[in-house]
A protein has these predicted regions:
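Intrinsically disordered, low-complexity activation-like regions
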Residues: 1-90, 94-205
Length: 205
């Protein structure tokens, strides 16, 4: 199966057109604002470009994308990353996490991650980091630690940062069994311990 044009558009938007040949740390630096920022203009751009495709993916209308590594990565991005921009601060931001997680596990079972550039593998793995299941968190740590050991020296600092971020997610799930910073958005009551935790720096992502 050739890469569907819409999948190619998702990948080019998220990583840049030269993402498969540029060193991972350079891709990460260039795309930083898109990936980790909270910019209403970027969110609006994601919405106008990809909301219809996100909804199609959520309705299993793009299941055939699971047949190639790059298309499967694009599918995971549509279900895991794009909703966090398009539906920021609403329950819908997390509504497709379970489906994204299923596709990530499928990709790992097929060894798809080994066919992708290192920077792409981070985003293939991220549904595990977003999961409130401790087994997923432990799997994520295992994967990202192994990946960080495999990259070139120039990329090491970037991937060590991803390991640190994964560790922070793991610690929260290990302690609370969920991400307390999602409670308000999802209408979940905080425990006293969670409320105290949320006053601390680094308690949300």
């Amino acid at each position: 199966m050739t890469l569907p044009p819409q999948a190619a558009q998702v990948l080019a938007f998220w990583f840049g057109a030269d993402w498969q040949t540029l060193p991972p740390h350079q891709v990460a630096q260039r795309q930083r604002a898109l990936w980790w920022g909270k910019d209403p203009a970027i969110d609006a751009d994601c919405r106008s470009r990809f909301e219809a495709l996100v909804q199609e993916a959520a309705a299993n209308g793009l299941a055939d994308w699971s047949e190639t590594p790059e298309a499967l990565l694009a599918l995971v991005l549509l279900l895991d990353q794009m909703p966090r921009n398009i539906y920021r601060d609403t329950p819908q931001a997390f509504a497709f996490d379970e489906l994204a997680r299923q596709y990530t596990h499928l990709a790992l079972a097929m060894g798809v991650d080994q066919e992708l550039p290192a920077i792409a593998r981070i985003f293939l793995y991220l549904p595990l980091e977003h999961s409130e299941d401790i087994d997923d968190q432990e799997y994520m740590l295992q994967l990202v630690r192994a990946l960080a050991k495999s990259v070139d020296a120039a990329d090491k600092a970037t991937f060590d940062g991803y390991v640190d971020y994964a560790r922070k997610h793991h610690v929260i799930i290990e302690r609370f069994g969920r991400f307390p910073h999602r409670n308000r958005i999802l209408g979940r009551a905080c425990t006293p311990e969670e409320s105290a935790f949320l006053t601390q720096p680094g308690s949300s992502f």
